[in-house]
Amino acid sequence: MSSPTVICVISMLTVCSSFNLTLLHVNDVHSHFEEVSVNTGTCKDDMKQRGECYGGVSRLATYIRQTRRLDPETVLLNGGDFYQGTMWYTVFKYQPVVEFSNVLNYTAGSLGNHDWDDGGEGLQPFVDGVNFPVLAANLASSVVRGVRRSVVVRLRDRLVGIIGYVTPDTLTISNPGPGNVFLDVVESVDQEARNLKSIGVNIIIAVGHAGYSVDQQLAREVEDLDLVVGGHSHTFLYTGAPPSVEAAQGEYPTYVRQESGRVVPVVQAYCYTKYIGHLQLQFDSAGELELPVAGVGVLSARPVLLDQTVGKEQAVERRLYKYQQVLQPYRQTVGTSLTPLLKVDNQENLLGNLVADSMLAAWEDVQIAFINDGGLRSSLEVGDITGEDVLSVLPFNNTVDKIKIRGSDLLYVLEWNVAGLCPEQTCEPVEFYQMSGLRLDMEVRRDNAGQRLVRAEVRQPGGAYSDLEEDQFYWLAIVSFLTLPGKSPIGELMVESVRGDADYEVLVRYIQANSPIYQTIEGRINIEYFA
């Protein structure tokens, strides 16, 4: 079970003045310790020369140090997914995650689903090694020790409670293994907020990893919360004209009004260290957000783009260097691309087409290939592609297996895969499949989940397409993750399977054989939305 609430020694305080709180936050770092490109791919040498790279822990360290110089009691939070996503995690696992997290000196951080990718055994060294509390109020674990429901910190004689949470979907989209129960987020956070309130804590922040929709639900339904700091959905929030290529998916902060009339801000800071969220909050003596011009209790708020105007902390750069030397063999060029191969969720995209094509080419006798959007972790830029780039795209050590499945069952899988799409196109990413060898037409209406496919066609050897037949068997190339219990229906429906090569090796071979890569959108997945 999670350890009980950890609090500071509390004395009876009578506070008559307002209280200003400076808060910084990041989420979904995913082992992106080095700076990234404008599209959050690998920052190439020519991009560095042009000043077109962003983020990285050395810039984070500079910004955090500068902010703490102005306010030494600045709160720094991380919304989870410390692990997984670059070659750094593939090669070194938890070691640089612990080192650089400790360098940044977080006040607290929540667990994310990918922090469980190597099970409890892979997570425990992180929980034991970091110098800040790791939080998840909705976790009951007999496997991982030391995860707390909340922590209370004293700032200028005010008590601030911080509650963590993580998506219950962790059971199906990661690998926590037995002995871990993920409870309802809203109920768990609400109960912990009540616990904190009962011992005199009246400023309460939730930090967690369940997505923008759940963040807003928490803000709406947990009456004791003052702020929600989120993660998981990689949501970019911004008020005004965005400073880079990301389109804002909502205001920063997003203000959520409770039934009582209280307003709770919700924030998130995209991903991969490209931005850091920066808030200045003002509370009255009762712990309620006050009402300045900029918003409800918010004196200032913005996600800060960590571009070339933010210098790199040289002490952190020296720490990076010792790892970079080990990684040099992975940085050999394996091919080139003439187009940017971007990862875009919930639709056909160039990166997905490339990877699915490589999987199809890995087997001589398969007709169709699938990979889930969640299995693709980074975009590829124009120019040279290195082994490091490929590992950043496919960091999970999956194999490209071939499986045999009946056509009727394949149609069921395809319907299941798109059931989470919403007509307004505002829903968070689902485990949408990128594919090769198939052409789909579908209509997404509010009430037609399970009946969205209008047409499903399979490409024939000559290049023509014909209808997918329900009574025919098909061979598919898929990533091994999708055959695991609970990850998709495929594992239960397939009638035969053959283990293949590592997905990383498959993609490297394909790039080497087909370079320079020129990928296009081909109409493989055609979706019409009816709001």
Language model region names:
Residues 1-2, 531:
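C-terminal end-of-chain detector
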Residues 3-18:
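Cleavable N-terminal signal peptides of Sec/SRP-targeted secreted and luminal proteins
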Residues 6, 91, 390-391:
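Hydrophobic alpha-helical segments with strong N-terminal bias
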